[in-house]
Structures are given as structure tokens and as C-alpha cells.
């Protein structure tokens, strides 16, 4: 069994793979105050709940965009799972060509997404990851990762409105009754959801001009389904794309 761990700014996502099959998955809140012992005990508990023990683990593959938590999770894996995790970083085998000007600055999650898409769907493709930040990633037919675009995620934008506009409330992201909000909550929901959908449609159109008409559009992340319900430009939704990418990266760097 392979344990994959994706450390994001909002969530820590884990997947347990039996071969290519995602056997179990979990999504935890990212907690900057949590110590290695707490992470380790939690990981042990998750394995137990999945009816597995440490003896069943054959490897751990980890990607992180939160440097201050990486060391804690690595320590937790060493001390509580008795295993040194494989950390996605510059210099590992990816099977794709990273054309970013500074490859070291590309988030490990973006590389994992690109690898998963290239191996599972092929290019050209635009991969949209709806997380704390929403990223658009461009992959050519030849398997080149070109880069992409980064913008604030929907929830981050909603929180910014609440934090910086005195009279605007904190809201749940739901579909309003109409594009024209008749109260403040519905107006905010309209602006956030439909405005975001329009942004996605516009970005996809611009990416397609660069990558060609055969470009696939694949979405992942917690809000992918919410956005996809409002537009036809998203062709494939893969909730656990990043974890799939980590599994593939593990296999590429640990051949049988």
C-alpha cells in the first residue's frame, strides 16, 4: 500500500493506494499549530480505520506547498509510520518536461497534477485546480509543462470581502436564485460564483488559443464540481488528481 500526502494551505489530503486503485482517502484541515506527534498519531488512526497496519505500507509520497509543515509531516512519518517519505522536489523523475523559467518555484501540487493528466489523459490540456489558490496549468501535446496562471480561490475571495468590507457578511458559497442578487448575501454569491465561472471560461478560451482546439480541460480540487455545474468548458472532473499524480511520481522514481 502506498500512502500519498498532499499538504495544501487549507487542507491536508491523504490517499491510500493498492496498486493503481485509490483504496481510501481523507481530507484534514491544515493546522499550523499541530506538532509532529499529533500528525503521526492521526496518520496511525487513519490507517487503523482503513483496516491496515504499518506492515501494509510500502511507501509514502509527499507533496507540500507549506514549507513550515513539510518537516513536521516528514518527522511524523519517520517516527510513527516507520518510513522515510519520498518528497516531490526538483530533480526527481517526472516523465514531463518542465519549461517554467525557474522550475524550483513550481508548486509540487502543480507538477503532480500535470503528471497525472499527461499519463491519464494526454496533452494538450489545461488543468484547473480549485484550491486556496486556483491554478491553471498548461501541458502541450508533447508532454511539456509550460506554466500557467494563479489567482485567488473562491473561498479566499469570499473571506477577503468579509475581512476588508465592513458591511459585508461571511457567506456560504451557494448558487443564488438569480444572477441579479436581491439582497446582500445573494449579490455576493452571484458575484463570487458567476463571476468566477466567467473568469474560468475566459481563461480556458485564452489557453485554447495557445494550446490549440484539441485542448482538454480537466478540473480538480474541492470546488471543481460547484464551478463545473455552471459551465460547459470543463470536460473532466477528477477529485483526487493530485494524489494520482503522487502515485505516478512514486512509481516513476521507484521502478520494480
Predicted regions and their residues:
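Short glycine-aspartate micro-motif
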Residues: 2-6, 61, 125-129, 218
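A short acidic, often aromatic-flanked loop/helix-cap motif at beta-alpha or helix-coil junctions
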Residues: 33-34, 92-95, 241-245
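Phosphate-binding/catalytic loop of phosphoryl-transfer enzymes
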Residues: 83-86, 92, 96-164, 194-204, ...
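Short beta-strand-loop/turn "lid" adjacent to the catalytic site in phosphate-handling enzymes
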Residues: 50-105, 142-148, 153-154, 182-193, ...
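Residue-level signal for inorganic ion chemistry
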Residues: 14, 62, 131, 161, ...
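Phosphate/pyrophosphate-binding loops at sites that engage ATP/ADP/AMP, CoA/4′-phosphopantetheine
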Residues: 43-59, 203-215
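Short glycine-rich, Thr/Ser-proximal phosphate-binding strand/loop in the N-terminal lobe
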Residues: 2-45, 143-170, 174-175
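ATP-binding/phosphotransfer module of carbohydrate and carboxylate kinases, centering on a glycine-rich
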Residues: 2-4, 30, 158-256
Amino acid at each position: 500500500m502506498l500512502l500519498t500526502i498532499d499538504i495544501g494551505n487549507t487542507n491536508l489530503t491523504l490517499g491510500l493506494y493498492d496498486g493503481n486503485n485509490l483504496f481510501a482517502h481523507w481530507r484534514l484541515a491544515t493546522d499550523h499549530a499541530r506538532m509532529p506527534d499529533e500528525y503521526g498519531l492521526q496518520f496511525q488512526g487513519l490507517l487503523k480505520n482503513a483496516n491496515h497496519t504499518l506492515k501494509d505500507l510500502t511507501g509514502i509520497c509527499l507533496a507540500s506547498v507549506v514549507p513550515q509543515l513539510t518537516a513536521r509531516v516528514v518527522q511524523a512519518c519517520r517516527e510513527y509510520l516507520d518510513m522515510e517519505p519520498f518528497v516531490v522536489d526538483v530533480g526527481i523523475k517526472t516523465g514531463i518536461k518542465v519549461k517554467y523559467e525557474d522550475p524550483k518555484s513550481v508548486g509540487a501540487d502543480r507538477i503532480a497534477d500535470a503528471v497525472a493528466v499527461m499519463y491519464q489523459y494526454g496533452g494538450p490540456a489545461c488543468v484547473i485546480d480549485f484550491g486556496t489558490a486556483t491554478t491553471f496549468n498548461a501541458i502541450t501535446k508533447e508532454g511539456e509543462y509550460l506554466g500557467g496562471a494563479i489567482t485567488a480561490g473562491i473561498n479566499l475571495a469570499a473571506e477577503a470581502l468579509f475581512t476588508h468590507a465592513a458591511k459585508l457578511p461571511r457567506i456560504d458559497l451557494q448558487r443564488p436564485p438569480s444572477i441579479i442578487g436581491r439582497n446582500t448575501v445573494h449579490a455576493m454569491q452571484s458575484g463570487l460564483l458567476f463571476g468566477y465561472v466567467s473568469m474560468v471560461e475566459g481563461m480556458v478560451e485564452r489557453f485554447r488559443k495557445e494550446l490549440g482546439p484539441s485542448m482538454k480541460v480537466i478540473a480538480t480540487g474541492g470546488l471543481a464540481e460547484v464551478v463545473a455545474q455552471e459551465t460547459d468548458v470543463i470536460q473532466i472532473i477528477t477529485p483526487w488528481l493530485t494524489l494520482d499524480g503522487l502515485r505516478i511520481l512514486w512509481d516513476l522514481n521507484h521502478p520494480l
